[in-house]
Amino acid sequence: MTSVRRIVGCLVWAGTFALAGTASGALDRSQVRIRDPFVLPDPATQTYYIYGTTTAGIFDGDVERKAVVVFKTKDLDHWEEPVSVWDVPADHWGRETVWAPEVHAYRGRYYLFVTLTAKATLPTPPDRPQNVKRGTEILVAESPLGPFRPLGHGAQTPADWMALDGSFWVEDGVPWLVFCHEWAQITDGSFDAVPLSEDLSHAVGEPRLLFHASEAPWVRCRGDIGELYQGKRYHAYVSDGNWLHRTKDGTLLMLWSSYGPSKYAVGVARSKSGRLAGPWEQDPEPLWSDDGGHPMLFRTFDDRLVMAIHQPNRRVERARFFELDEVGSTLRIRGEFGGAKR
């Protein structure tokens, strides 16, 4: 594991973190810029592992360093300095961007799901930004601290798709990769799922469409609300940051992100069958609408259900935690969790 303390003050962007240190080396959550935060509780050590990525502005000699990193914390507010759990090799297929890491414990090992982007381009539909090779790759380690190693030789999402934000779900003993198909390729971004081999090394079937972003009444076209991409306005509906959750009454929910009437938001979909295949129906209003997103849920060591998001959605992102109540098949935000409140 390699300390990345020397990134203090660097300029970073989507899918990344930055920090300002203290003399003791301890970090207050409010100091750490992090996008797409992922929390893995470890009951054995009463430690929370919080994963992020660094993408720009860090060099080892002439080689720009890109890595997945982890912070350790006992209380979710005071974080230890980050260490690298996977440095993306210089010759790796996906070194352009490193986004949205998730780490899942499964059958005695730890699996890292991370979204990577290549320089390689894909055929681009009319009136779309240049399409590039992007997908979620799965890596494995014996410890939540890594080091992680790739399971295969590329992404487990379809090779010709712009896919991102891969997450993990197991249904009837079958592991699934659940991910987003990006608006830049298909206009109306979608959520899809593909079954994985027992060792998670490769897909064993064709991807299955779950739903499109535009199906939610609260979602707005990014172009209509003035949300530009690379300086241009596109007619498109964004699908981001999916997370599956089974409520105590057995309802299967998906939390996910897109743009609402004016800001980035978190919505909730529910499976009418209680299974991954759906059909899925959308809550009419978002769960969270104040310019934050990419949700994931975890339970604290005293069994409180907490949602992690980044907020705001650009440039000064911070991890925010909200305690949730399950009310039948519905989630409600009780209030912000922890001391590092906005």
Where do the PLM segments sit?
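Intrinsic low-complexity, intrinsically disordered segments enriched in polar/basic residues
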Residues: V4, A18-A23
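Bacterial N-terminal signal peptides
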Residues: G9-A20
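Carbohydrate-active catalytic/glycan-binding domains of CAZyme proteins
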Residues: T22-R342
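Bacterial N-terminal signal peptides that target proteins for export
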Residues: M1-L11
